[in-house]
């Protein structure tokens, strides 16, 4: 069994080759042990190489990945054929992903984005069979709006333990966070820096100067203050260390009030195939 997941995860999206291997090796050396990837990222071999060269035991790592339906442009409009959910097809893709990662199990697997209720329930049912075999330890979802989570709640074939969503000082969702706390669901934030848009914000910079921290650390600290874990990317040892040290920053009421004055509901990850958000 892998170690407990960290509050601050290493995000591996768009880590370029060969920089990715060096970045992941450095992160592991500095104390990261929770790694976020996805089948669509196509970087599993890089992660495997970095882990191998770092000599970190698999049991000390927490690896999470994501699955999604690809190359179906109108996948939110039509129900999939039963063949889309065939055990052999899913098994083949999952086994290839595990082979590329050079591991025989994942600590967590997420449904990357919602589609239709019948599709998502069918996929969760399939994933539960992998969970029963120990191939997947936990099954999560990502980008599921609150109304959709409530809609699925009584119909789920398995309990969910997490929803990974975009969250940052300009996009907080108190209703989602409250629902998560009252339903034993963890929230994992991605894009906690708002695609770097907040790093030059005068309010964030003012708070950073007060705490002798970087603007990125203030954004991360704000997420952590909501009892939210997060995934964040960095490509230099200095930034990797800064991100981890964000846990040490304690924001006060004045900081929270200033951050609350920032513009609200700014979503930076909203491609055409995104769900309809509440």
Label for each model-derived stretch:
Residues 1-61, 65, 71, 275:
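N-terminal binding-site loop/beta-alpha segment at the start of enzyme catalytic domains
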Residues 59-72, 108-109, 143, 167:
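A short, structured active-site edge motif that brings together acidic residues
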Residues 2, 48-58, 97-102, 131, ...:
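Acidic (Asp/Glu)-rich catalytic clusters
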Residues 114-278:
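Beta/alpha (TIM)-barrel catalytic core signal, keyed to glycine-rich beta->alpha loops juxtaposed to Asp/Glu
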Residues 72-85:
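Surface-exposed, active-site-proximal loop segments in enzymatic domains
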Residues 101-117:
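Active-site groove signature of glycoside hydrolases
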Residues 16-27, 83-101, 122, 149, ...:
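Short, acidic/polar
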Residues 32, 103-106, 136, 160:
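A structural motif
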């Amino acid at each position: 069994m892998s170690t407990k997941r960290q509050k601050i995860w290493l995000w591996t999206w768009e880590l370029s080759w060969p920089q990715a291997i060096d970045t992941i090796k450095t992160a592991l050396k500095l104390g990261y042990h929770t790694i976020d990837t996805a089948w669509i990222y196509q970087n599993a071999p890089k992660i495997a190489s970095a882990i191998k060269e770092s000599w970190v035991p698999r049991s000390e790592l927490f690896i999470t990945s994501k699955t999604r339906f690809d190359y179906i442009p109108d996948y939110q409009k039509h129900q999939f054929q039963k063949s889309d959910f065939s055990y052999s097809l899913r098994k083949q893709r999952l086994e290839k992903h595990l082979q590329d990662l050079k591991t025989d199990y994942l600590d967590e697997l997420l449904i990357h984005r919602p589609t239709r209720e019948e599709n998502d329930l069918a996929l969760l049912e399939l994933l539960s069979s992998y969970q029963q075999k120990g191939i997947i330890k936990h099954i999560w979802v990502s980008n599921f709006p609150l109304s959709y989570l409530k809609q699925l709640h009584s119909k789920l074939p398995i309990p969910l333990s997490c929803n990974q969503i975009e969250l940052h000082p300009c996009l907080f969702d108190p209703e989602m966070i409250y629902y998560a706390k009252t339903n034993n669901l963890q929230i994992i934030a991605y894009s906690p820096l708002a695609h770097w848009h907040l790093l030059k914000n005068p309010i964030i910079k003012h708070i950073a100067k007060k705490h002798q921290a970087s603007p990125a650390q203030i954004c991360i600290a704000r997420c952590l203050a909501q009892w939210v874990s997060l995934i964040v990317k960095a490509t230099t040892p200095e930034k990797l260390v800064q991100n981890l040290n964000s846990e040490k920053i304690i924001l006060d009421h004045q900081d929270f009030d200033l951050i609350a004055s920032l513009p609200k509901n700014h979503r930076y990850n909203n491609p055409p195939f995104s769900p309809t958000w509440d």
